[in-house]
């Protein structure tokens, strides 16, 4: 994989046992709709890797990654419940980069800078393969659900509206 952005090369190098086929879209794939249009797949086959912070009853905060189908919205109350927290909030741009090593809009489902819990919405299973960000807002890669499960090791739950 030559001529990839540094973040995509770093992600590909961090993953073993999976041949990552990164595709670059210079016009960008910032939204699920943009990505689906560029790839030619349903919006539901796009994985949005969202970074949220869950907060427990003592006020302790923990960043988590939530994998959501591109056509659905995260339900923050369901996420909090699944995470054993009292509430959740969207992570700031600085929190996203600190927790994952990637910028918002390009966060991949695995290969993060720090150990971080990952949750995946059950409705991602409607498509196989799915497409996820490869470290930047202009790169994506296809991945089977089996490989996504093996590499991201998510807690599968219903966390969308």
What are these regions (language model features)?
Residues 1-161:
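Extended, low-hydrophobicity, polar/charged segments
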């Amino acid at each position: 994989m030559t001529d990839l952005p540094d973040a995509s090369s770093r992600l590909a190098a961090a993953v073993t046992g999976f041949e990552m086929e990164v595709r670059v879209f210079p016009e960008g794939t910032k939204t699920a709709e943009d990505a689906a249009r560029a790839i030619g797949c349903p919006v539901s086959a796009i994985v949005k890797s969202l970074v949220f912070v869950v907060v427990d009853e003592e006020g302790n905060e923990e960043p988590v990654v939530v994998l959501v189908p591109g056509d659905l919205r995260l339900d923050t109350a369901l996420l909090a419940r699944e995470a054993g927290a009292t509430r959740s909030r969207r992570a700031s741009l600085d929190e996203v980069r600190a927790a994952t090593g990637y910028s918002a809009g390009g966060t991949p489902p695995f290969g993060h800078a720090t150990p971080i819990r990952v949750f995946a919405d059950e409705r991602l299973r409607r498509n196989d393969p799915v497409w996820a960000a490869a470290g930047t807002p202009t790169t994506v890669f296809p991945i089977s659900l089996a490989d996504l499960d093996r590499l991201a090791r998510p807690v599968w739950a219903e966390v969308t509206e």
